[in-house]
């Protein structure tokens, strides 16, 4: 099937993917008086006396906003708010289908960090949570951190943390299959945007010690003078041999071809076709290849297997081991809303990844991660998101 043509046809047929549906009957004067005037005044009075009652009397308890400025949409880049709206609608459909959560797509016609933060703070009283989506790095880091500290509802940038959680879950099962230990494996992360940074931080929290990051210029290391503040921070936690001795052979300076040699795991959140078969052959025995660029991965699975890969995962649904955020974000917000979690912590993210990995009872190279359609996946992630 030509999914591009079919998608365009269906989007036009249905005028998008969402509609508003009433939960209550409105068939007569009594209904009108109960659900609108004069009856609606009573829940208003109760909420005015105690704002926490808004969770009892309105949609807030099970409703989130999916918010984007359209600057980092899929593999399309900065296409603007209107062009990003179909993705935000789709995200809302997934929240409803997999977690039963009401979600509203909101696209903002500004790239200004202060304006985005102020706008979200102004509309936050309607929502029980905020899912940030497709906002480019490095602005996305400040926006998320500021909102987390200034709002009293959970805020998550899914491109960062959803990707990181599903990636870690795949690695946990991959290590079981290859009989390698997290303390010993050497990882390369190709791509230093929102996803790459969050993946790296979560892997380090999990206990992985040796990570090298590569951007379009080359490896991240202290000797580079072109690094933004986020990449500067990464020089303290990745490619750490460079901190001890920049002239050491363990300090990797160069491009992807140099950085991938002798690595156990390649994680790509970068660009199509950048990983060659020769690069895969230069890795350690039984390497794992997580080629997550969409829609075309860093290397096609067939080529990776031919070059000796033991496990291959991509972001695509037409290959095994699809590392898709839909395995994570419905459960994260279901748990957060149900358990009244204000802040989604690192410990919760680690637990969510472990739960997702353990959901696959007997992982094999062709199945290191479950399908989002398997019953129980959402609840296994949601159970990790609780206070205490």
PLM-predicted stretches and their roles:
Residues 12, 55-60, 96-97, 122-124, ...:
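Solvent-exposed alpha-helices and their adjacent loops that cap or buttress functional pockets
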Residues 74, 81-99, 157, 161, ...:
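Glycine-rich phosphate/diphosphate-binding loop of Rossmann-like nucleotide-binding domains
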Residues 105, 131-134, 155-158, 189, ...:
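General beta-strand structural signal in soluble alpha/beta enzymes
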Residues 158, 291-388:
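Adenosine-phosphate binding glycine-rich loop
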């Amino acid at each position: 099937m030509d999914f591009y043509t079919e998608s365009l046809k269906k989007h036009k047929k249905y005028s998008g993917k969402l509609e508003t549906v009433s939960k209550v009957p409105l068939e007569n004067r009594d209904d009108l008086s109960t659900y609108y005037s004069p009856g609606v005044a009573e829940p208003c009075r109760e909420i005015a006396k105690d704002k926490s009652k808004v969770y009892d009397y309105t949609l807030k308890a099970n409703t989130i906003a999916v918010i984007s400025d359209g600057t980092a949409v899929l593999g399309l880049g900065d296409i603007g708010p209107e062009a990003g709206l179909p993705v935000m609608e789709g995200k809302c459909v997934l929240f409803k289908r997999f977690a039963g959560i009401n979600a509203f797509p909101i696209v903002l016609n500004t790239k200004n960090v202060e304006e985005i933060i102020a706008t979200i703070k102004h509309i936050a009283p309607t929502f029980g949570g905020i899912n940030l989506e497709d906002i480019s790095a490095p602005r996305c880091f400040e926006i998320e951190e500021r909102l987390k500290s200034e709002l009293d509802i959970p805020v998550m940038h899914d491109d960062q943390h959803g990707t990181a959680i599903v990636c870690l879950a795949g690695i946990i099962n991959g290590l079981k299959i290859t009989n390698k230990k997290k303390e010993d494996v050497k990882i390369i992360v190709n791509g230093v945007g929102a996803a790459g940074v969050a993946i790296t931080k979560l892997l380090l929290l999990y206990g992985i010690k040796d990570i090298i990051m590569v951007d379009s210029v080359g490896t991240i290391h202290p000797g580079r003078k072109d690094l933004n503040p986020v990449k500067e921070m990464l020089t303290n936690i990745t490619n750490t041999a460079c901190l001890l001795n920049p002239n050491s052979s363990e300090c990797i300076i160069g491009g992807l071809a140099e950085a991938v040699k002798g690595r156990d795991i390649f994680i790509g959140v970068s660009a199509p076709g950048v990983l060659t078969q020769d690069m895969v052959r230069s890795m350690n025995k039984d390497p794992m290849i997580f080629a997550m660029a969409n829609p075309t991965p860093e290397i096609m699975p067939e080529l990776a297997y031919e070059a000796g890969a033991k496990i291959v995962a991509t972001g695509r649904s037409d290959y095994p081991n699809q590392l898709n955020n839909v395995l994570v974000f419905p459960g994260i917000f279901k748990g957060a809303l149900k358990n009244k979690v204000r802040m989604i912590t690192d410990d919760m993210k680690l637990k969510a990844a472990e739960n997702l990995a353990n959901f696959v009872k007997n992982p094999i190279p062709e199945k290191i991660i479950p399908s989002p359609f398997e019953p129980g996946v959402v609840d296994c992630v949601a159970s990790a998101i609780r206070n205490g």
